[in-house]
Amino acid sequence: MGKEVVTRGGKPFQSKLAPYEAEVKSLKSDGVSVRAIAEEMRVRHGLAISHNAVASFLRTHGARRRSFLDGISETRRTELLKAIRALWTHDSTAIEGNTLTLGDTMAVLEYGLTVKGKSLKDHQDVVAHANGVDFVRSILDKGCIKAEDVFALHRIVVPNETRDIYKPIGAWKREDNGTYGAEGGRSVYMPYASADETPELMQDWIKAFNARFGGIADGKSALEAYVFAHVSFVRIHPFFDGNGRLARLLANLPVLYAGFPPIVVPSEARLDYIRELWDYQRAVGVISLANRELLPESSRLDNLRHLVKDWWQTTLDLVAKAKGSAK
């Protein structure tokens, strides 16, 4: 076996490029030459690597990605994906106030049924979210995202109703937004990132997100990538509407890419979920260009990590059951 090529920094290029695997593969799939990829890695991440190192990395990392569906028969795989899609859709939309039950949601998605006594908007929201799940799965192999992907997902997830120019679908917010929470027995308003600063902050977010996209080696790093993407996206709240649903979808991209089932925030945990996000954001302050660290550490963040780990168990159990049934 030949010696592993080492960069000027003394670290093997395989180790240096590993966190950016998805990014490198995405550039290659877009037709970018290995020489141009090496230069792009230098500009984006300060990596001093040769084009030969990039070519070698691509050769040794060309194997098919693992998937949580591996080892499951085609029939059970289809049923498992339907179950996860319906659960994810139900819980995410229920957190936002949708009144359809999980059974209702499955009937709407599977058979296109209309549930008596439920609003048209409730039906539209679950169909839109399920389409969002499909979109997320469709862009997995890109290994990175661009603003256009986030805009496309927003157009899919937020029903295309008549809006004014200050509430655009598929574009960053044009008006400041915020939320109210209880603190010390009184109602307190907390702003999100300003509309003027959102485009630049989202550039930061997308760059940081892509750096984590393909560098996941285990469940712990998958959980960390999810928490980072989810909470930092919510801090910015880049759209006038749909931010929670998009955060819960986008944050699962690195999780799915690494071969794990998605993390689904259960609807019954809605109050805990909202409270922990609120408490964390109050603890670290409003994000801005002057205070642009995307995810400052806080004890409140540890609380969220523990909750997310618990919530993940639902889909992990679904997969384990499907694999157990296949034996």
Model-derived segments and their meaning:
Residues 3, 8-11, 29, 38-52, ...:
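FIC/Doc superfamily catalytic core
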Residues 14-32:
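Short, amphipathic alpha-helical "recognition" segments used to contact nucleic acids or chromatin
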